[in-house]
Amino acid sequence: GGGARSGDDVVAKYCNACHGTGLLNAPKVGDSAAWKTRADAKGGLDGLLAQSLSGLNAMPPKGTCADCSDDELKAAIGKMSGL
């Protein structure tokens, strides 16, 4: 591997298909209010990470990035949410 991918790289390759458009009620990239509501309900950024690891509704585990590390996913969530 080429080392850790940045949050931007992960978002662009794996997250944007749904989170870029709000497909299937996914919180949109940059919609900090929608992300904050979810983060507050789930225990912050770590809670959102835990949800992403297990999958949620239409989102598969790790949101299609099966080989992403927890740190890469957390960076991507941070980029999308602004949290």
From Swiss-Prot:
Write out the PTM section of this UniProt entry.
Binds 1 heme c group covalently per subunit.
Annotated signal sequence is: none
Q: Which cysteines are joined by disulfide bonds?
A: 65-68
Provide the GO MF annotations for this entry. Answer: electron transfer activity; heme binding; iron ion binding
Q: Which domain of life is it from?
A: Bacteria
Subunit note: Homodimer.
| PANTHER family named in the record | CYTOCHROME C5, PTHR40942
Describe the family membership recorded for this protein in Swiss-Prot or TrEMBL.
Belongs to the cytochrome c family.
Know the name of this protein?
Answer: Cytochrome c5
